[in-house]
Amino acid sequence: MICANQHHIDSQIGRPIHELDTPALLLDLKASGRNIAQLARFFADKHAQLRPHFKNHKCITLARRQLDAGSAVGITCAKLGEAEILADNGFDDILIANQIVGDIKLRR
């Protein structure tokens, strides 16, 4: 969850699926690790820069794993609020892929 604390996440482990609040990200960590590594290997010798999109999973831990794999140069997000969450969690190379509209958001 994008704004869940670790205690809340830990309390959900082992619960039956029908008892989980949605949306909920359920993930096979081994498969996820293999996919992240495969994508990093693919981009390792390419003349292109990988910038995974945060909106796909909205998970700080996965975003960090994607960057730690070595081939990503930063993270992409769709909204200013997502960028703020990423920045608050130590990400410093963030691309907002959509327009930021309105003075209030521009000042943020």
What positions do the PLM features span?
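Generic N-terminal amphipathic, Lys/Arg-enriched alpha-helix
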Residues: 8-27
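Active-site-proximal beta-alpha core segment in soluble small-molecule metabolic enzymes
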Residues: 53-108
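A generic short-segment signal for beta-strand/edge and adjacent turn/coil regions
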Residues: 18-22, 43-45, 64, 89-92
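Short, acidic/polar
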Residues: 4-14, 79-83
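N-terminal glycine-rich anion-binding loops that anchor highly charged ligand groups
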Residues: 7-12, 31-62
